[in-house]
Amino acid sequence: MENRKNYFHLHLISDSTGETLIAAGRAAAAQFQSSHALEHVYPLIRNRKQLMQVMEAVDGAPGIVLYTIVDRELAGLIDQRCREIGVPCVSVLDPIIELFQSYLGSPSRRRSGAQHVMDAEYFARIEALNFTMDHDDGQIPADFDEADVVLVGVSRTSKTPTSIYLANRGIKTANIPIVPGVSLPEGLLTATKPLIVGLIASAERLSQVRQHRVLGTTQSFHGEDYTDRAAIAEELKYARSLCARNNWPLIDVTRRSIEETAAAIVALRPRLR
């Protein structure tokens, strides 16, 4: 079949941490190197209100929907809304669960996150996920000292997906956008506990990703310079200077996967391992 797109939106909806979906989605996407998956991860979706907000996001950026939702009513709602929107969706675990049921001759428990043992480590991961979702993109800037890691960087340097990946390892992570001319929160500059790391990428790569981002929106929503390489180069220059002034380590994510970026962050502070 002819390759239709060089990028696509991949929506991953889970009633647990989302690790299963992330692994499955990336394994599948890796088979199509000419198409780049723009991941949207929605963990801990367990009621209708949460799910309807997710489906609004899917409607705004149509693409492939993968989900692991054991509640049959919610799963049915995903199927229904995806049909209405006109996007494909797959319940990743259902075929596997049905195979187990057939072979073992007994029904499954249909319990969210049943693969996780309810121990201290598990609850730490859930706490980290909640913290990270609450502190995405500069939200709640007053309590940075509760974070283990704070990621700073210009737009589209994978701050959010990297934060969620770290949270899945029990690492409380906040992220802050770097915008030239806009001061960083005062609480970040006085924080003593978190490891603060700057994320950068090449201007060429950021321009490509941002061009994909603005598709379906108006350029004026982001600003005329949002995808301009020269303007992006100035943003990166400012970000490098800011990190250098504050002695924050920098990681170039241009050719790194989310997993590789997270590993590089953890390597900077052994206590996070």
From Swiss-Prot:
Binding annotation for ADP: G153, V154, S155, R156, T157, S158, K159, T160
Function description: Bifunctional serine/threonine kinase and phosphorylase involved in the regulation of the pyruvate, phosphate dikinase (PPDK) by catalyzing its phosphorylation/dephosphorylation.
Highest taxon listed in the record's lineage: Bacteria
Protein name as catalogued: Putative pyruvate, phosphate dikinase regulatory protein
Transmembrane segments: none
GO MF annotations in UniProt: ADP binding; ATP binding; phosphotransferase activity, phosphate group as acceptor; protein serine/threonine kinase activity
Organism field: Sinorhizobium medicae (strain WSM419)
Reaction equation(s) it catalyzes: N(tele)-phospho-L-histidyl/L-threonyl-[pyruvate, phosphate dikinase] + ADP = N(tele)-phospho-L-histidyl/O-phospho-L-threonyl-[pyruvate, phosphate dikinase] + AMP + H(+); N(tele)-phospho-L-histidyl/O-phospho-L-threonyl-[pyruvate, phosphate dikinase] + phosphate + H(+) = N(tele)-phospho-L-histidyl/L-threonyl-[pyruvate, phosphate dikinase] + diphosphate
Family in the record: Belongs to the pyruvate, phosphate/water dikinase regulatory protein family. PDRP subfamily.
Enzyme Commission code(s) on record: 2.7.11.32, 2.7.4.27
Stored InterPro entries: Kinase-pyrophosphorylase, PPDK_reg
Lineage: Bacteria, Pseudomonadati, Pseudomonadota, Alphaproteobacteria, Hyphomicrobiales
Annotated keywords: Kinase, Nucleotide-binding, Serine/threonine-protein kinase, Transferase
Enzyme class: transferase
